[in-house]
Amino acid sequence: MATYLVGDLQGCYDELQLLLETVQFNPVQDKLYLVGDLVARGDKSLECLRFVKSLGAAAQMVLGNHDLHLISTALGIKKVSLQDHVEAIFTAPDFVELIDWLRHQPLLVHDEKCDFVMSHAGISPDWDLDTAKSCAREVENELQHGDYHYLISNMYDNQPDRWSADLQGLQRLRYSINVFTRMRFCYRDHRLDFACKASVEKASQELIPWFNLDNPLFKVQNLVFGHWASLVDTPTPANIYALDTGCVWGNRMTMLRWEDKQYFVQGALKDYF
């Protein structure tokens, strides 16, 4: 049995299949973890959704910002982005089933046996692991059982940009969503920045990658995330695994076999823009 973790798919279905062939993935005995953003700018978002769903217990994903945006467009809250290629999802006979399945996916996964925590964008520099799990569950409960239409309608905002244990209701949920699905840089006082998507080398000196801030959790816990394609080839601490290497941007898709920490890469097969 092997455990594989793969970066953002963004509709790059063929590259995923080639990676799975390379590692000889066997869903009967292996497990595939996906850091989110199954859909968006690649041309096979529908195939990505169907495939991951078909794997059942052999796959585990976390929700990314593009996955949440797809749910939003399915609800009629937002329009499809001009850069996204998700039209086939909306005309698919299993459209409703796929969106319902997606809505029931988590924001955070803690594999205690393998000893890693996975989310799409990261974990707040102000959270310990218990707080991160609790905040993830709060959002997941609303998405899966609560008034998810109201939540999705009101998640598009950059505030609050700083954690407080006193945050309640929509403010608390929105902060958690932004941390789990949108965060990249923070200020030294731990405020979230949403403007900069650049590499660490090109960012303002006042901005710090979330994983480089002072949080005891970041020093001892294996953390796996995607979302930040411009981090490609940027060194991270030994226990921090950044898996989005920008396949949809013409770079490559990266898969990590957890047991021996071996990486497998597949270059983009086409220009998606």
UniProtKB/Swiss-Prot annotation:
SUPFAM superfamilies for this protein: Metallo-dependent phosphatases
One MF annotation (Gene Ontology) recorded for this entry: bis(5'-nucleosyl)-tetraphosphatase (symmetrical) activity
Domain of life: Bacteria
Keyword Cytoplasm: no
Catalytic activity: P(1),P(4)-bis(5'-adenosyl) tetraphosphate + H2O = 2 ADP + 2 H(+)
Pfam family, one: Metallophos
Keywords from the UniProt entry: Hydrolase
E.C. code: 3.6.1.41
Family, similarity comment: Belongs to the Ap4A hydrolase family.
Function: Hydrolyzes diadenosine 5',5'''-P1,P4-tetraphosphate to yield ADP.
The protein, known as: Bis(5'-nucleosyl)-tetraphosphatase, symmetrical
Species this protein is from: Histophilus somni (strain 129Pt) (Haemophilus somnus)
Gene: apaH
